[in-house]
Regions:
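Bacterial N-terminal signal peptides
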Residues: 6-16
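C-terminal structural segments of small proteins and small subunits
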Residues: 92-100, 105-112
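C-terminal partner/receptor-binding element of secreted or periplasmic proteins
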Residues: 111-120, 124-128
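Short S/T/G/P-rich N-terminal loop/turn motif that feeds into the first structured element of a domain
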Residues: 14-82, 90-97, 123-128
């Protein structure tokens, strides 16, 4: 009886290991946008940008995740970048749909004359 249970467990574990090895890790596409705002921007203008960007997930179905924050690095290597937004998509088609979406175009109009510098970085990450 003990040998039978051991063999069944071994087969189940082997099957799980094979299934896991055959399945590719699921990835998501992260779209990172960082800003340095112009020195003459008011706190209200910066908040307008934050609110406009933060509203995009409700307007663009392709967005599956959204995060934002301000720089708190102690390293002093941010080159003046103060705000970061991370938008997550399931694939490149989602990012492409977002970039040409009217809500994105409207957001760009809000931010374009308030930013001094923008850095955009896209990468594939393991889905959680």
């Amino acid at each position: 009886m003990h040998t039978t249970i051991t063999m069944v467990l071994a087969v189940l574990l082997l099957g799980a290991a094979i299934a896991t090895a055959d399945e590719p890790a699921r990835k998501v596409l992260k779209h990172v946008v960082m800003y340095k705002f112009r020195d003459d921007c008011t706190a209200e203008q910066i908040q307008e940008v934050i609110d406009a960007f933060s509203g995009l997930p409700k307007k663009v179905d392709a967005i599956i995740g959204f995060e934002r924050g301000t720089n708190v690095s102690q390293e002093g290597k941010s080159e003046g970048l103060t705000h970061c937004f991370v938008v997550t998509f399931k694939d490149e088609a989602g990012l492409a749909a977002y970039l040409k979406h009217p809500a994105h175009d409207a957001y760009v109009k809000v931010v374009k004359d308030k930013r001094e510098k923008v850095v955009v970085f896209d990468y594939w990450a393991d889905a959680k």
